[in-house]
Amino acid sequence: MNGRKDEELKDLTLLGNQGTTYSFTYDPNLLEVFDNKHPDRDYFVKFNCPEFTSLCPKTRQPDFATIYISYIPDKKCVESKSLKLYLFSFRNHGDFHEDCVNIIMNDLINVMEPRYIEVWGKFTPRGGISIDPYCNWGRPGTKYEKMAEYRLLNHDLYPEKIDNR
């Protein structure tokens, strides 16, 4: 199998760009995608994003998290540098943890149209409580819809020991 051709990569404007600018304002338009060369196969792509930050919508204090994104692509995959810059754009975005993971998932669904996706935020404690929102989605009317229901019901059967992360 040959590598990707320049023509296939022409829409990726952020990867390899040495003049990267970081947006401090939430911007879903930063997300870029490329063609999945293996649409005939189910496989997971997982991103571990340990440097996510956003702001509490009330106090404007910073919140920190590791965001885990797993998806089964269909025709498109998200490009990782664009994902990094997109997640960075939450830096000054004021929203609750639950909102952030759902916004991330919705934006990725809009740009990729995956077969299945899940987003799990593991936020560091504030006030002695850590919050770990989880959301997922499977394409309606397919086996992925059933998969989403099953994974939601079973996503945290073996909770981790919390030691302030």
Curated annotation (Swiss-Prot):
A Pfam family it matches: QueF
Gene3D superfamilies the UniProt entry points to: 3.30.1130.10
Alphabetical keyword list: Cytoplasm, NADP, Oxidoreductase, Queuosine biosynthesis
Any single GO CC term annotated in Swiss-Prot or TrEMBL for this entry: cytoplasm
Gene Ontology terms: biological process: queuosine biosynthetic process; tRNA modification
Subcellular location: Cytoplasm
GO molecular function list: preQ1 synthase activity
Catalysis performed (reactions): 7-aminomethyl-7-carbaguanine + 2 NADP(+) = 7-cyano-7-deazaguanine + 2 NADPH + 3 H(+)
Positions annotated to bind substrate: V78, E79, S80, H97, E98
Pathway: tRNA modification; tRNA-queuosine biosynthesis
Similarity remark: Belongs to the GTP cyclohydrolase I family. QueF type 1 subfamily.
Protein role: Catalyzes the NADPH-dependent reduction of 7-cyano-7-deazaguanine (preQ0) to 7-aminomethyl-7-deazaguanine (preQ1).
Protein name per Swiss-Prot or TrEMBL: NADPH-dependent 7-cyano-7-deazaguanine reductase
Gene from which this protein is expressed: queF
